[in-house]
Structure formats: structure tokens, C-alpha cells
Amino acid sequence: MPLSSQGSPADMDPGSANTNKNQNRSGSAGPSGESKPKSEQKNGSGSKQRYNRKRENSYPKNETLAGQTRRSCPQKSKTFNKVPPQRGGNKQYGMGRREEVAETQRAEFSSAEYSGPKKINLNHLLNFTFESRGHPGGPHSANGHFGRRHKWANKPFNKELFLQANCQFVVSDVNDYSVHFTDPDTLVSWDFVEQVRIFSHEVASCPICLYPPVAAKITRCGHIFCWPCILHYLSLSEKDWSRCPICYSSIIKKDLKSVVATETHLYSVGDKITMQLMRREKGVLVAMPKSKWMKLDEPIHMGDLDHIQYSKLLLASWEQILNYVIAEEKFALFEQYNAEKETPEACFIEAAIQELQDRAESLCTASKPEIEAATLSMKTLNFEATCDKPNTVMEKEVVHYISAFEEETMEPPCEDCSPTESPPPDIPAVLETEENTVTDGVLPLLSQPESKPKNDEPLANSHYYYFYQAVDGQHVYLHPVNVRCLVHEYGSLERCPEKITATVVEMDGFTMTEEVRRRHRYLCHLPLTCEFSICEIALGPPDVSVKTLELFTEEVEKRKRLRQRKARDEQRREKRIEIEENRKQGKYPEAYIALENFQQFPAFSSSPVYSLSSVETQNFVSISPVSCSPTSQSGSLLGAECSLDPSFTEDESRCPSFAQMLRAGKAKPETWPKAAHKNVAENTLTPATADSDGESDCSERVPVPSFQNSFSQAMEAAFLKLDTALPTPPSSVEKGGRRKKKQQKLLFSTSIVHTK
């Protein structure tokens, strides 16, 4: 063969001896023919391989085995589909879902499995799991169509949607906003917004300087800043945008919009509130007072002060934007610049003034063609008005409806007859007919409120919604209980009074959702995520009669009991939370000592507490004998008895002397008191009973004895019973007449054992 005839590189190389030595050394590990040169012993990354080819052959076997075990895992499940997949087809849906779950698990634990220089996520050690807001049910939800039916039930929170649902926007009148008249959830383009108006119960403050904002600007995420402060903050970043210091959303300078924050009154329980009757046409998203209602084809203009608070969008011309938006910001910036001219913030105030001037110039240049078109239209309108002037005069002369009803009105009145002579005979008849119609028509309708809307304007009620809203324009609406009372009194909401003033009984806050829309149809004009309140007021006789209130007394009282129960539960919950927080801080409740316990704390006073008939039957149990001597106890007892019983003399009340005790001998009186009878102890230890709920507003009541006191008293009574000597039976007499000796008990012995 040609290879055998040629010499090997090892033979030709002068250093072949060294190579042979290396081959001989490696012969113990494996055959010499399998060894590779140095160039072949390096892998693709340049690192040397530590093992030879024979050692490397074992790895593919393990990989195939591991692959087989991994592939065989799905086959063990009962739901595994054994049908082979089609050629060129996609994966099965079940396997794809399983792979997605495995991928998420692998992504969750990958940071903990593989160590490296980067930070390691150790959330799995804390058993920390969370679900996305969009899919709370997970893939194993019971109903697969839940998300499609309730598209807003699990919708994630959107800051821009919340901002546009709870604010009022001043927009330019150049654009078309007809879409916002049909869908309340349609977002207004942020580029069309000239000013944002926020109605809040608190005064807004800049989170950077902590002062009321000057020439305030609002971001798309809904946070308000001073214009110089936010310019200073944006200048610190090297990029064109920066993170919001509150919520870390992106802030761009061109997205900053002018904002005006208006403080509104926060209604609470006990306040007086005035509710106004509102009217809204079905299909229209603007509700107005019934007395000021008008047909709308476009959003309300900024100059309409009567309806400006009831619309979400306000149309403004370029002149109104210059006068009401730019001029006010310019005045505030100049005032701040004069006050802080020597401070480092002056440069940012100058930058804000320059941007404000650029905005005014761009607005004027954009409005020039519109001004020219408006002047041309005004000229054409004036020319048409001058041409049609005689025609309009003729039309005004022709349209006289007074002569069409009665021919007698055209005739001149007679001067001889006075106008008061003919009406008197007709007035009583007219009044009687009017009274009959009123009494025949109104009274049955008040007794039957359902029939009243049917008789009067059935079509009008089907095209309009009537409801009560706060007079200042806040989203505060009347409770259904009050609405039913008014409907029963007046027949329908359309005939209810224009305004009602009453005291607030309860305020419930809500957020608009699809479910709330289906429940309250009259609030369909509110966008999703809009916050509103339902207010229950105390209606009185001026607005509702006493007879109507009696019909709804049961329902009103039921709601009152529910409120009281809710308040009690809230109070108990606050107490539990307070105790838990104090326990975390090492503060524990103080020990409760029952001072009404006469066994532990006997009362000695001059006023009689008990009438003692005999000393033997009624005895006070004094303090524990460990803390006082028997003589002191006897003296105190005698003193107490003397104060309680007037038959005691002064000599008997004194303590016996030592000589008297010696003379008395065995007949000495008992110095240790006896235990009091059970009924006396029970009478002295009866505490005041608490109410059923364990709660009482009266703070001066006697508290309920704790378990510690009752248990200690029971133990003390048991020990006192054991201490009292039981009556000994009569001693048995023997036949011989001798008494039986009492068996003596050996206490201790003094005998000594002697050892040898």
C-alpha cells in the first residue's frame, strides 16, 4: 500500500524519541494507536480534551438513554395520544400547551439551576408565585368561554384608560369627535388634548418639590409635576426620555400636557347634599339637568358655563386656548421667575417660558388658514343675508299663529264693554273642571305608581333616562331605595322635584364594570374604570309624605341594622389589627385585675354592707394568711363586725391580751376566721352582665371578669372547703364502758441504732 511505503512523521522528526516516550506512558490508559496529535486533541473552543476517545464513546450512550427516558415520560400518562403525527404537520395542541408550561417552569428555575456571575433569582425558595391579571383562571379553568363572555372581567389595569375615564379634557375644535358620542370607552388621542382637568378631594402637590405645582404638567401615567421641576428631572437623563419618579413609566417631553386640579367637597355621613334631577337621551353620552336639557350633536364648548361640568370633552378654539390655557401658565411662570431669579432653577423656568412661546406661535400659524376660511365663510354668509333680507321679512309677517286659532282675536275689542265682565261666569266652571281633572287623575296615579307613566307620555319615557346626581357635577348618584320612595310618591322620576336636599346616611363607592353597567342601565354613559358613589339620603316630609315613608320603613330599618352590624365588625377588626401590631412591636395588653373581688380586695368602710345576724354564720374572709398574723386578722375582723353591728361594745371590740389568753386556756376564741358561706361570696362576686354583642358604648360599666379571676376564685373556694374541719362522728363506746382509744399517728422517731 502507498501509506506503508511512506515514512511516518514520527520517524522523520528528530524529536521522535520523545514522542514514543509519551506514547508508551499513555499505553497504560489505552491503546497507543488511538492517541491523537496535539492539534487534534483540541476542541472547537481551543481547550484540550482531558479524556481519550474510548472515554468519549460512553457519552452518546448516556445521552440516548436520557433521551429515551425523557421521551417515555408522556407515554405513561393516560391521556397520551398514540397516533403518530402527520408528516409536515404541526405539533399537537396538547403537547404544545405542555411544552409552553415546561418552558415557563424552565424559565422560572433557570436562574437558580445555573450559577454564574449574574444575580440569581431565589423566589422559588420563598414559595413565591403569582398569576398574571389577564389569566387568573389558568389553562385548567372550568369554563373556556369565560374570558370571551366577560371581556372586562379580567382586564389588566391600564393607567391611560383610568386617567381618561376620571378626567375632563379640553380638546381643539378642529378634529372630529363623533366617535366619542357612541362609545364611552373610546380613548381620546393624546395629541389632541390641550388641557386636562382633574377633580379631586385633595390638593395636588408636586412630588419633586412638595409644593403646589406651578404651570402644572401631567404625564400619560397620570402624575402631576411643576413644569420647571419636570424639565430639570428630564435634563438629568442622557436620553430623550426618562422614567417617571413615581411609577417608573416612560416620560417624553412632548407628551407633557397642561393640567388644572380642582378640589371638590368629599361628602361623608351626616353632611347635607343637594341632588339634581338629570335627563339623558338613550344613545347619547351626555347627561344634563332636566331644566337645562338641550339636544346635542357635538361636544359642549368651553364657553358654555351651564353645561361645562357634565361633559367629558370640551371643545376649545385657538383663541380660547391662548386666553385660558397658555396665558395662565405664562403668568404663573413669570411670577415664579421674578421670585427665583437668582436661584439655579431660573434656567429651567426660562426654558419653560420659551417652550410656551413656541407653542403659542405654532398654534397661531396652524390657525391662520382656518381664520382665512372663517372670514370667507362669514363674507358669504353676510352676502346671503343681505340678498335674502326681504324674504325673511315676508316670512316673519306671514307666520302669525294667533289669527289661525280664533277669528275673534283679529277683531278690535269693544271700548264700551270691560274685559272683566264676561270672564267671571266662566271662571268657576273652568276651575271646577280643572279640580275634577286633577283629583280624578293625580290621586289614582299616586296610589298606583305603575299606571302613571303609561298614561302620560309613554314614548318620552322610553327614549330618556332620569336619575339624580350631585348638583356640583360629581359622580354621586341616588340610592335605589330613595328612588323607589320618590317614584311611589310622584308616580315617575320625570315628575319628581328638580332638586332634593337631605342628609347623607350612607356612601358606597364603586368602579364601573360590565356587570355594573348591566345592573344600572342609566349609568351606561360612564366609561369603564370610572369611579362613582351611590348615596342614600334621609328623605323627609317636605319631599316625601309620611304615608310613603311608612311603606318603606321595614326596608330602611333593615339597611340601618346592616350598617350598625358592619360598623361593629369594622371596630372589632380594627381592635384585632391594633393588638396584632402591638404584639409585633412587643407591646402586650396590661393585666386586668378585678377590683370587685371581695375575697382578694376586702372593703372596710363605715357604711354597712351586710346586716349580720350572728357572728358565727356571717364571717368575712380576709386576705391570705401569708401576709398578716392571726391576731391582726382577728382584730380587723372584730373591728369590721363592730362597724357593721351596733350591739358590739367598745370592750368587746378590743383585741384579747396575753393574760386573757392564758386565763382562757383551752377555751380561747378562734383567731382564724372561717370561710364565708357560698351565697355571700356569690352575692359579692356577681358582676354586671354585658350586652349580647360584648360591645357597649358606655365606658363606665363594670367589666366582665376574666377567666383568670374566675378560675382563681374557684380554686380558692375549693381550698377553703378542704381547710374547714368536718364534723367528727361520736366516739364508739366499748362493752365495758371504756372509750376506745384514739389511734395515734407517728410523726417522727428519735431512736438511735447502735452498731457493734
UniProtKB/Swiss-Prot annotation:
One GO term describing the cellular component: nucleus
Query: Could you confirm whether the keyword Transferase appears in this record?
Result: yes
The subcellular location is: Cytoplasm; Nucleus
- Start and end residues of each stretch annotated as Disordered: 1-100, 682-702, 725-756
InterPro entries from the xrefs?
MAG2/RNF10, Znf_C3HC4_RING-type, Znf_RING, Znf_RING/FYVE/PHD, Znf_RING_CS
Which keywords label this protein?
A: Cytoplasm, Metal-binding, Nucleus, Transferase, Ubl conjugation pathway, Zinc, Zinc-finger
GO biological process, alphabetically ordered: negative regulation of Schwann cell proliferation; positive regulation of myelination; positive regulation of transcription by RNA polymerase II; protein monoubiquitination; ribosome-associated ubiquitin-dependent protein catabolic process
Tell me one GO molecular function of this protein: ubiquitin protein ligase activity
Pathway field of the UniProt record reads: Protein modification; protein ubiquitination
Identify which top EC class this enzyme belongs to. Answer: transferase
Zinc-finger keyword on record = yes
SMART domains from the xrefs? RING
Query: What does it catalyze?
Result: S-ubiquitinyl-[E2 ubiquitin-conjugating enzyme]-L-cysteine + [acceptor protein]-L-lysine = [E2 ubiquitin-conjugating enzyme]-L-cysteine + N(6)-ubiquitinyl-[acceptor protein]-L-lysine
Gene3D superfamilies in alphabetical order: Zinc/RING finger domain, C3HC4 (zinc finger) (3.30.40.10)
Superkingdom per UniProt: Eukaryota
Biased-composition ranges, Polar residues, are 16-29, 59-80
Q: Which EC numbers does the record give?
A: 2.3.2.27
- Classification via Pfam families: zf-C3HC4 (PF00097)
Known CDD domains for this protein?
RING-HC_RNF10
Give the main location: cytoplasm
Q: Where are the zinc fingers (RING-type)?
A: 206-248
The entry sums up its family as follows: Belongs to the RNF10 family.
Its job? E3 ubiquitin-protein ligase that catalyzes monoubiquitination of 40S ribosomal proteins RPS2/us5 and RPS3/us3 in response to ribosome stalling. Part of a ribosome quality control that takes place when ribosomes have stalled during translation initiation (iRQC): RNF10 acts by mediating monoubiquitination of RPS2/us5 and RPS3/us3, promoting their degradation by the proteasome.
Q: What is this protein called?
A: E3 ubiquitin-protein ligase RNF10
This protein's encoding gene: rnf10
